[in-house]
């Protein structure tokens, strides 16, 4: 492990010149503790997990340097951080194949900012945020892609503050492609302020996009093709979407229903 902090109450800070490359097991590991943790250096990972933060009940953990995680890397995992704040602002380049790329579950507040963040997988979910609040700065990715995951994107109970934005770069498909999911391609439940642009949803076994109890949903320049394999599956399936859903130049072709 490059850095391992377990039940640390004091402050831990490193400067921008720091670097961790392919540490055994986990590059940056934080378990418990309440002190502020700030890492401004880079992380390059091609084997274990790049970042793993768990069981924090308070305090902040901030990563302001670039993080690159490539297969067979195991991505970023944040779990059971009730009361803690976790922030990523230095740029994420995650390409983790069958492993989930970015996962936050079980509490706390998380933000991902910057214009160049990407997450690409095969059968791993690109982004999962479940029972965890997306903070005011939001969760921003330039592109999200998966091929054969259960879900490509999963948001569930992400709080009442902010949401996920996929920006693309202005050209078709530049926001990524969620394809061949065994379930719903993009699953949104009890989420808000979700904005998806230039994202393709193709060949997902259930709905291409399912939005249940979502407030403020914006879809822009999206193409949804051949989603669903049953009589109730849809290209887009909204259920109790609050605020005016805003679709702009969205094309839905050959849904199952």
Q: Can you describe what each PLM-predicted range is?
A:
Residues 1, 10-26, 34-48, 56-73, ...:
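Beta-strand-rich solenoid/repeat architectures in extracellular/passenger domains
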Residues 4:
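Extracellular glycan-recognition regions
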């Amino acid at each position: 492990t490059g850095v391992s902090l377990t039940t640390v109450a004091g402050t831990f800070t490193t400067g921008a010149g720091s670097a961790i490359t392919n540490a055994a097991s986990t590059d940056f590991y934080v378990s418990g503790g309440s002190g502020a943790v700030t890492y401004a250096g880079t992380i390059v990972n091609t084997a274990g997990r790049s970042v793993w933060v768990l069981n924090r009940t308070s305090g902040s953990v901030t990563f302001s340097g670039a993080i690159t995680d490539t297969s067979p890397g195991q991505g970023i995992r944040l779990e059971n951080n009730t009361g803690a704040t976790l922030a990523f602002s230095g740029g994420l380049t995650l390409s983790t194949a069958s492993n989930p790329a970015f996962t936050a579950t079980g509490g706390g507040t998380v933000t991902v900012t910057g214009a160049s963040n990407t997450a690409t997988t095969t059968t791993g979910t690109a982004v999962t945020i479940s029972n965890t609040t997306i903070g005011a700065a939001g969760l921003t990715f330039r592109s999200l892609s998966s091929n054969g995951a259960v879900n490509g994107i999963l948001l569930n109970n992400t709080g009442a503050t902010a949401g996920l934005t996929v920006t693309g770069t202005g050209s078709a498909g530049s926001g990524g492609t969620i394809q061949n999911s065994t379930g719903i391609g993009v699953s949104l439940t009890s989420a808000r302020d979700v904005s998806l642009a230039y994202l393709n949803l193709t060949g997902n076994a259930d709905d291409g996009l399912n939005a249940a109890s979502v407030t403020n949903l914006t879809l822009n320049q999206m193409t949804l093709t051949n989603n669903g394999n049953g009589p109730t599956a849809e290209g887009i399936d909204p259920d109790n979407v609050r605020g005016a859903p805003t679709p702009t130049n969205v094309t839905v072709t050959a849904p199952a229903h």
